[in-house]
Curated annotation (Swiss-Prot):
Enzyme class, UniProt record, top EC level: hydrolase
Pfam families per the UniProt record, alphabetical: FBPase, FBPase_C
GO biological process: fructose 1,6-bisphosphate metabolic process; fructose 6-phosphate metabolic process; fructose metabolic process; gluconeogenesis; sucrose biosynthetic process
Full protein name: Fructose-1,6-bisphosphatase class 1
A GO molecular function held by the record: fructose 1,6-bisphosphate 1-phosphatase activity
Catalytic activity: beta-D-fructose 1,6-bisphosphate + H2O = beta-D-fructose 6-phosphate + phosphate
Binding site residues for Mg(2+) 2: D103, D106, E270
Gene label: fbp
Subunit structure and binding partners: Homotetramer.
EC number: 3.1.3.11
Binding site for substrate: D106, G107, S108, S109, N198, K264
Length: 323
């Protein structure tokens, strides 16, 4: 099987980006080990602190964030990082050429039940005229991403990665410690009969989403004339991995509870990297009003609605917004 380095070189990734990705993934391998230790290492459960999002931090949130912050700060390739667990950007090397945004442990509420979790990341070029601690450096649309991916910590540790030449899947070979290519240029099926949404929020959805999901649930007796199954992992990384692997539509739409907060998922380190992977695999990614990758960020922890997955199904969903 082909190793990660070989595939990155084939895809034309510059050497410095390859070295940065290797550094980042070394941190992810350390996180994978910590996750696998679980209760044996005393890393389960919550801390007494909250992150900038107002969310109670799990112990593994804090550990994972520190691992990535340390390894990226020391690499020399990174000018600054932005993380879900950090209030502000973290300055690294003033001469670094890249910015890295990440969610160190997506789905961390699943740690205590031994369910799917993962690390999500995106990389952009660092504007050389900006200071390393200037958050405006990160306010670039997703179209500027040079690499994005996630590592899923499941029965095996799997990496989904794109540098703009397709989305590839790799599996961590724990015997030799490297990621091996296991699926090249994955293509998301254009059609699907699966959808992923947190149905407990149904009463808060806007009419287009209410109507669309209602038609899916109606199944073969409704206007879609076929049955759909709902899947929900409660970790974006797990749901997106399923969609990439076998198709589907994933939704975390705007709801009416807080008009000042247009979505649940963060643009820089959740929505953008997943949208990049999905488009590179032939899928679509939208806010309901436009392409996710074209959203111009206004702050590093900005949230957006998310609809992404199988091309034809996302197009069908978006047609409800135009009705």
């Amino acid at each position: 099987m082909k190793r990660l380095n070989s595939q990155l070189q084939e895809d034309g990734a510059p050497m410095e980006l390859i070295l940065l990705l290797r550094t980042l993934l070394a941190g992810c391998k350390e996180i994978s080990f910590r996750v696998s230790q679980g209760a044996l290492a005393g890393v389960l459960g919550s801390t007494l602190s909250e992150n900038v999002q107002g969310e109670t931090q799990k112990k593994l949130d804090v550990i994972s964030n520190q691992i990535l912050k340390d390894i990226l700060s020391e690499s020399g390739y990174v000018k600054a990082i932005s993380s879900e667990e950090e209030d502000d950007v973290v300055a690294c090397n003033p001469n670094g050429n890249y910015l890295v945004s990440f969610d160190p442990l997506d789905g961390s509420s699943n740690t205590d039940i031994n369910s799917l979790i993962g690390t999500i990341f995106s990389i952009t070029h660092a504007p050389q005229w900006m200071d390393a601690d200037d958050p405006s450096a990160f306010l670039q649309p997703g179209t500027q991403i040079v690499a994005a991916g996630y590592v899923l910590y499941g029965p095996s540790a799997m990496l989904a990665l794109s540098t703009g030449r397709g989305t590839h899947l790799y599996t961590l070979d724990k015997t030799h410690g490297g990621f091996l290519l296991t699926q090249k240029n994955i293509q998301v099926p254009a059609q699907t009969s699966e959808f992923a949404i947190n149905a407990s929020n149904q009463r808060h959805w806007e009419d287009p989403v209410q109507n669309y999901i209602g038609d899916l649930i109606a199944g073969e007796d409704g206007p879609r004339e076929k049955d759909f199954n709902m899947r929900w992992v409660a970790a974006m990384v797990g749901d997106i991995h399923r969609v990439l692997s076998r198709g589907g539509i994933f939704m975390y739409p705007f709801d009416r509870r807080n008009p000042e907060m247009p979505g649940k998922l963060r643009l820089l380190y959740e929505a953008n990297p997943m949208a990049f992977l999905m488009e590179q695999a032939g899928g679509l990614a939208s806010t309901g009003q436009g392409r996710i990758l074209e959203v111009m960020p206004t702050e590093i922890h900005q949230r957006v609605p998310v609809i992404l997955g199988s091309k034809e199904e996302v197009e069908t969903c978006l047609s409800y917004y135009k009705a």
